[in-house]
Amino acid sequence: MKTMEDLFLDSVADMYYAEKQLVKALPKMAKAATDDDLHSAFESHLAETEGHMRKLEDVFAAFGQNPKSKKCRAILGIIDEAEEIISDNKKSPTINAALIFAGQKAEHYEIASYGGLRDWARGLGKAQAASVLDEILDEEKAADSKLTELAETCCNIGAKAGVVVGT
């Protein structure tokens, strides 16, 4: 990268790709969930994720750029693990706990990425872009908190007890 702005835009392209991939993965995770609340959480986050793509388009626009995608190996690895979890845990009491674990891996990656991008946008003097990235960051943190709540109140308990929740 030649400049900080180049690094920033390259990283935004990485996250734009990541969000596109999550739009494809979240319906599979929702379908695999046997707990109604977890199913709903994945569906709600799908709508937010589609919104994140639009918000990232606004970030590109703030820099006078058209949206671009750059292959994000990190999210592809996380999604591959999620698909493996679904395959290995179908009809198992652990399916919902495993899906939460996979979902939180994605959320934590996004939280780290959007926090860094927000800080870079501030440093580049792009307050509007920083504000948009902060909105996305808040939504990712809320999604992570929802998954934690579901894990602690039912899904991990069901997995430990050997009960398939919701079936």
Language model region names:
Residues 1-167:
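Amphipathic alpha-helical hairpins
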